[in-house]
Structures are given as structure tokens and as C-alpha cells.
Swiss-Prot record:
The keyword Transport is annotated on this UniProt entry: yes
GO molecular function: polysaccharide transmembrane transporter activity; porin activity
UniProt keyword list: Cell outer membrane, Ion transport, Lipoprotein, Membrane, Palmitate, Polysaccharide transport, Porin, Signal, Sugar transport, Transmembrane, Transmembrane beta strand, Transport, Virulence
Protein name: EPS I polysaccharide export outer membrane protein EpsA
Covalent lipid adducts (N-palmitoyl cysteine), residues: 24
Organism of this sequence: Ralstonia solanacearum
Compartment list: Cell outer membrane
Signal peptide segment: 1-23
GO CC annotation, single: pore complex
PANTHER family according to UniProt: POLYSACCHARIDE EXPORT PROTEIN GFCE-RELATED
Amino acid sequence: MFVSIPSIRKTVMSLCAVPLMAACAFAPGMRFDPQRPLDPADNASVPKITQITPDLVRGGQAQVPRENVDVDQLLAKATPYRIGTGDILSIVVWDHPELVFPTQTYSIGSAYDIANFAGTPNVPGYVVSTGGDIQFPYAGVIKVAGRTQNEVRDEITRAIARVVKDPQVTVRVLAYRSQRIYVDGEVKTPGQQSIDDVPMTLVEALNRAGGINVTTGDNSRIRVTRGGKQWVLSMPALMHQGIDPASVLLRGGDIVRVEPREDSKVFVTGEVVRPSTVLPRNGKLTLSEALGEAGGVSPVSSDPRNVYVIRRAAEGEPQVYHLDAKSPVALALAEGFELRPKDVVYVDAGGLVRWSRVINLLVPTATPLIGAAAVAK
């Protein structure tokens, strides 16, 4: 059967024409369609798009809400250490060594910081019982839990004054075992820490843990847990507000966790020069900074009128923000729009670029047909 050359050419053109007319629909790669429902079975699940405008930025809606910015409950002045259950006390009555019994000698490991005690781990001491008391010669049972060293000293002095003339008493805490905090996360030496006579501030706790890991730790997301309540503290934000981080006083049972920086990363994808993940600096990252870290929008393939920020919402459906960045003035709006952890910044491709990509896919398919037509001719 004879097939004419014009017929072959018409067939080739017909095969190419259909996908070309639907180039945008069949173009490879991602594309954001604001009219496409999130759930194919629910036509009403079209995402709501919020325009990034000067009013949005001025109204503060473009700012990231700060978690538990009210840190007043954590701020306190340091007070003298108060003795607790399990602490070991040294009680010395000068010129009366008979008041120190050999049976009151305890072995204290190097985990406890006993300063200036002749370098020996075996020291005479009195362990505070679970009831919060100790027993001392000629003084009987003394309640010491919740009291300072000076308060205990004064009571013992009064109690033994009837048998010891002008007693000179010294009371020290040898081992601090009653109150502990726990430091976890991105610090060099996470673990348990005992609260002692040095006020356990946030700065002190982090220093004892070796400091925040500079490569993986996020100093803008330090989580403090106390009694079921949590605060997320930012060192830069505290200092910006004029609050000394050393004024954050920790209590026994507190948990301090330094969150990893990786948890705060933002994804920049689409038609940018370098699709990548971007980490915030000092807990803050704007849309303009994220685009800048990715090399900016691609001058060849991007449609700067369609810059989107996709944010996961608590209720499940994503929040979508749109910026028309065709004009460089729009970058000022982008600088005022703060990104949140795990936001996705997407720059759409231009219509001509999508059409060109379809052509590039069709050319390898159409070339053999065109070659066959030439041979038949």
C-alpha cells in the first residue's frame, strides 16, 4: 500500500500538535497550580493563598510568633544554697575533735566537687536523711532540710552551748546530692548536674556542659522544662530585650535541652540558582535571606511573579503565601517576611520554559518519524 509523503507529514504534525497544545499541563518538574485541590476527591480543598503585601508585613502577620516569650517565671536573684535530702555535711566544732565520730566517715567520689578538702575522697560527714534531718552529739536530731549552712550552724551552736563553752562551729556542704538538673541536646557533654553553692543559672549550666556545639546547636532554641511547662529561650533574643541570660535561675528537676539547628532549616526549591536547605542565623531567617542563600531566582527559567512560601499548618492543610517579585522593590517585602522552621520556598517556572521542556521531550520522539518521511520521499 502506497502512503504519500504529505500524509506522513500530516501524521507527524498531528502527533506533535496535541502535546504542544497542552505543554503546560505535561511539562516535567514541579508546578504550583493555585486552582488545583489538595485532595483529588475533594474539589473544595483548594489551598488559600495569602498575598505578601505591605499591610501584611506592617500588621506583624509576617513575623514568627515567639514561644513563651514571657520568661519572668524563670528570672530570679540567686539565694544561698539550701540543704536538702541526701546532702553530706561537714560539721566541725573547733578544739573538740571528739565530736567527730569515725562512724560518720563517708566515701565521696570525684563526681562531686569538693573544693579545698586536702585532696582526700574520704571525709567525715553527716548524711541528711530522707526526713530532712541529722543527728549531732549533744544537739540531738536537728532539722536541716530547707535551711542554709549558717542557719544550721547557729542552731548547733545554741544546742551544744550547754556542754561546750563558747563553741566555734563550722558547717559546710561536702557533697551536693539533693538537687539536680539535666542538660541534653546539642552540648558537648550532656548529662546530669548537681546544684551547689554556685547559682545554677542557664549560662552556668551550659558552661558546665561544655557549651553549645557551635556547628550543630541552635542558641535561639533552648528549651527549659519545669513542672510540665516549657519555655523556648533564645540567647540573642534575650540579649536584644536587655535580659541577661545569667539571670535565668534553674531549679532542681529542671531539664535544659539545646535544639539542633537542623530542626530549623528551610527548603528552597524550584527555579533558583542553587536549590538547597538554609539554616537561620540567631534564630531568624527572612524570605529575602533564603532566596539570597540559594543564589536568587534563576534569571533564565524562573517566573519571579510566582514566588510561594508553603507552610504546614497545625490543622493539616498547608498555608500558602504568594509574592510577586517581578519588581526589585518586592525584595523589601521579602525582607520583612520571616520564615519558620520547615517552610518551603518555591519559585515557579515561566510558561515559555515549561513549553520548551515539552519540546525537548518531543524532539527525540518526532525525529525518527521525520526521518522515515524523508526516506520514503
